[in-house]
Design a protein with these regions (language model features):
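Glycine-/charge-enriched secondary-structure boundary and capping motifs
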Residues: 1-108
Length: 108
């Protein structure tokens, strides 16, 4: 999404929703093998400033539990989140798109 447009996605890790129990299991070092392959694949395109190792593992977890990332114009984001809420669909603003920085994706 960012690579082809010369942009950077800045994802705010504190805004990422996680299921109950994920932090506890992650702190025990339990996670899928695919997360490590995803991290390796993304490699040089990503910079992580996440301080908790378990949360960094979560962002690379291949099991999204139906998760979906949408990029919408910033002036429409709040309205979209409200409309999703009316339909009992969980949604929220977890980041922004900026001009290209040193990486295509930054987790802060």
């Amino acid at each position: 999404m960012a690579n082809g447009r010369g942009k950077t996605l800045v994802i705010h890790s504190v805004k990422l929703p996680v299921m109950d129990g994920v932090a506890e299991y992650g702190q025990m070092g339990l996670g899928p093998e695919g997360a490590y392959r995803n991290r390796e694949f993304a490699g040089e395109a990503i910079r992580s400033e996440i301080r908790e190792l378990w949360k960094e593992d979560v962002v690379f977890d291949p099991q999204t539990s139906g998760g979906l990332l949408l990029a919408v114009p910033s002036d429409e984001a709040d309205q979209l989140a409200a409309e999703l809420g009316k339909m009992d669909i969980s949604g929220g603003i977890i980041g922004t798109v900026t001009e290209l920085q040193d990486k295509y994706v930054i987790f802060d």
